[in-house]
């Protein structure tokens, strides 16, 4: 991709060029941009794009051009067009989505894939990803539409054309490997090597949300070291996802059943990332919209009760949150 320090922005250019994978939402993006005041041109071969842009933009304050890159000839023409685009300082948005998402979207149309009509649908999708990889590398803005509906796509485009930074939707998921890992995880951590509260009878029926279990787990040096490394990686990675205008980042942490260790680490991670969570007084600052999901917590609890019976009655004493400080991890802000 173009260097971020020198890339042109849609907020300062009257023209926006769009390309992307079939099914990623190029047509919908043009429609949404037209509602934002743009004149839209769709399916333009690269060798015609320069002429059309130069002919139309003097009469239109904002112009969005979606390129047709389905044939090898068009992809060869793109290189010459892109040299002109860069010289003009025109931003270039590339739309993509995960292959299985594209498969589901395109299956509803029940027609051959326009990129490689002779191939099976999934095979054609995977081939298009490979064919357009050099095009993707030249974009100034990258948008993954896998989890966007039309309204969310409009919000992302509106933020793009107005130069408004958007919060990254950071989804923190705990899960149990015995039930299956989440298929949409961007970062996945296996913490089954940590001390297992299941083998502590007084902790077995608790969850990673309970302070006694958290205290037991985070008193262990290996847990502390593991958590620090997970926190450091997530803290280092999420700004780059946001800089590339990816709307979502899913971080999954798994243990055996998804009740104890993974839940405790996800809860702690959400707490420690709070200083970067929205709302923020300065919209230009990096910001997160943190969502927590304990994917298999109830499944594990039901299975545990079926095996060992219901949990013992609570002692009736309110549990106090115990937070063991860890070096290299910031303390949460005071409310």
Curated annotation (Swiss-Prot):
> Does DNA-binding appear among the keywords?
no
Task: Give the source's domain of life in one word.
Answer: Bacteria
The Gene Ontology terms for molecular function here are: ATP binding; GTP binding
Which segments carry the region annotation Disordered? Answer: 306-335
Recorded hits in InterPro entries, A to Z, give: P-loop_NTPase (IPR027417), RapZ-like (IPR005337), RapZ-like_N (IPR053930), RapZ_C (IPR053931)
The disulfide bonds in this chain are none
Provide the binding site for ATP.
20-27
A Pfam match is RapZ-like_N
* Function text: Displays ATPase and GTPase activities.
What HAMAP family does the entry give? RapZ_like
The entry sums up its family as follows: Belongs to the RapZ-like family.
Show the PANTHER family listed in the entry: RNASE ADAPTER PROTEIN RAPZ (PTHR30448:SF0)
User: Could you identify this protein by its name?
Assistant: Nucleotide-binding protein CYA_0911
Organism, as annotated: Synechococcus sp. (strain JA-3-3Ab) (Cyanobacteria bacterium Yellowstone A-Prime)
Taxonomy, top ranks, is: Bacteria, Bacillati, Cyanobacteriota, Cyanophyceae, Synechococcales
């Amino acid at each position: 991709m173009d260097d971020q320090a020198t890339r042109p922005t849609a907020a300062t250019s009257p023209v926006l060029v769009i390309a992307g994978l079939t099914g990623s939402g190029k047509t919908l993006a043009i429609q949404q941009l037209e509602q934002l005041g743009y004149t839209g041109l769709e399916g333009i071969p690269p060798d015609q794009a320069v002429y059309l842009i130069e002919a139309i933009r003097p009469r239109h304050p904002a112009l969005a051009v979606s390129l047709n890159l389905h044939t090898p000839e068009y992809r060869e023409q793109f290189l010459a067009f892109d040299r002109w685009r860069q010289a003009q300082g025109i931003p270039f948005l590339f739309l993509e989505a995960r292959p299985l998402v594209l498969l589901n979207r395109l299956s509803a149309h029940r027609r051959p894939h326009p990129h490689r009509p002779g191939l099976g649908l999934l095979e054609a999708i995977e081939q298009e990803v490979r064919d357009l990889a050099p095009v993707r590398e030249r974009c100034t803005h990258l948008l993954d539409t896998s989890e966007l509906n039309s309204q969310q796509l409009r919000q992302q485009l509106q933020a793009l054309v107005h130069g408004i930074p958007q919060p990254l939707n950071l989804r923190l998921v705990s899960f149990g490997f015995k039930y299956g890992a989440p298929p949409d995880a961007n970062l996945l951590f296996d913490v089954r090597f940590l001390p297992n509260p299941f083998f502590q009878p007084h902790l077995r029926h608790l969850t990673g949300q309970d302070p006694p279990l958290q205290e037991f787990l985070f008193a262990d040096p290996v847990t502390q070291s593991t958590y620090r490394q997970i926190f450091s990686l997530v803290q280092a990675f999420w700004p780059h996802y946001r800089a590339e205008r990816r709307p979502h980042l899913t971080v999954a942490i798994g243990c055996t059943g998804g009740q104890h260790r993974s839940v405790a680490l996800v809860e702690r991670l959400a707490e420690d990332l709070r200083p970067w969570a929205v709302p923020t007084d300065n919209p230009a600052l990096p910001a997160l919209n943190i969502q927590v999901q304990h994917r298999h917590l109830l499944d594990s609890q039901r299975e545990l009760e079926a095996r060992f019976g219901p949990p013992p009655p609570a002692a009736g004493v309110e549990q106090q949150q115990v937070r063991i400080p860890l070096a290299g991890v910031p303390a949460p802000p005071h409310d």
